[in-house]
Amino acid sequence: MVRIIPMAASSIRPSLACFSDSPRFPISLLSRNLSRTLHVPQSQLFGLTSHKLLRRSVNCLGVAESGKAAQATTQDDLLTWVKNDKRRMLHVVYRVGDMDRTIKFYTECLGMKLLRKRDIPEEKYTNAFLGYGPEDSHFVIELTYNYGVDKYDIGAGFGHFGIAVDDVAKTVELVKAKGGKVSREPGPVKGGKTVIAFIEDPDGYKFELLERGPTPEPLCQVMLRVGDLDRAIKFYEKAFGMELLRTRDNPEYKYTIAMMGYGPEDKFPVLELTYNYGVTEYDKGNAYAQIAIGTDDVYKTAEAIKLFGGKITREPGPLPGISTKITACLDPDGWKSVFVDNIDFLKELE
């Protein structure tokens, strides 16, 4: 950006930025000559008449303003594109210590279906996809088992997953019967009427059970803790194109939540951001991995993420071997997300 030096009221002073690229006017030489010949008019020092100096300064101002306008246009264009992009939360990825045990718990206690499973022996890991409907239209779970690793640190930053069920009490009884852990018995949420309960899976991941009627997305929430809620909301609105659905402050318990997503909570999965008063950083552990989101253009997505404060950890482009285009990033709190090309994602499922 061109730097504009303010003009003095008593004289016309050209910006040194206008001359700094010219070998004829190195700044050190100008300073030395100025000190030796202060009695010479400035217009003669630079070999320019006053009206030419004025025109040069005005041109510099014009360049700066044009640059600002172009930047503003780029921001506006990207904001509009992000808002119009066809985005959907595809799956949430995390690591488990015993794949078979976890699949058994999710299918028998939580009513999920095993959608597909793949083993990658050359890279020593296995993936399993579970959920309440096909991957091309539902938010699902992607479990990762790394050979020989049976335990992970969940950390303090990850909160819980949310699952909508018809009858919370009945689900809790089933969890107990299967040897699962219940960390909060069924009952109304504090300050509200919705019946909830909290359970833990065999690896210690927490699940909030929410009593709701029939919903197209039973796997309905991912809760993450953030150190600056306003910053996080702005980032997810601008860079991810999410909508702020609602906020709720709980001064009695010293925390605030914000629900972000691509549609209403009762029909779409949401990201629940939680801010605990006075806590600005969290240990994220090594268990929770990321959320995957569909996009029509991973390249433009990466541009928007960079522009609005995110960090790209994998530049946009195809994955080796399968040609699926992705880009990966960190939000301002360090939570990872991966954007996947919509068409490529559907091809993977064929």
Swiss-Prot record:
One of its GO terms (biological process) is methylglyoxal catabolic process to D-lactate via S-lactoyl-glutathione. Residues 88-212, 218-342 form the VOC domain. InterPro entries: Glyas_Bleomycin-R_OHBP_Dase, Glyas_Fos-R_dOase_dom, Glyoxalase_1, Glyoxalase_1_CS, VOC. Substrate binds at residues 95, 146, 160. Belongs to the glyoxalase I family. Its main location: plastid. NCBIfam families: glyox_I. Keywords: Chloroplast, Lyase, Metal-binding, Plastid, Repeat, Transit peptide, Zinc. GO terms for cellular component: chloroplast; chloroplast stroma; mitochondrion; stromule; thylakoid; thylakoid lumen. PROSITE patterns: GLYOXALASE_I_1, VOC. It holds the Pfam family Glyoxalase. Residues 1-61 form a transit peptide. The keyword DNA damage does not apply. Catalyzes the conversion of hemimercaptal, formed from methylglyoxal and glutathione, to S-lactoylglutathione. Zn(2+) binds at residues 91, 142, 160, 208. Its cofactor is Zn(2+). It comes from the Eukaryota. The active site is at 208 (proton donor/acceptor). It is found in: Plastid, Chloroplast stroma. It catalyses: (R)-S-lactoylglutathione = methylglyoxal + glutathione. This is Probable lactoylglutathione lyase, chloroplastic.
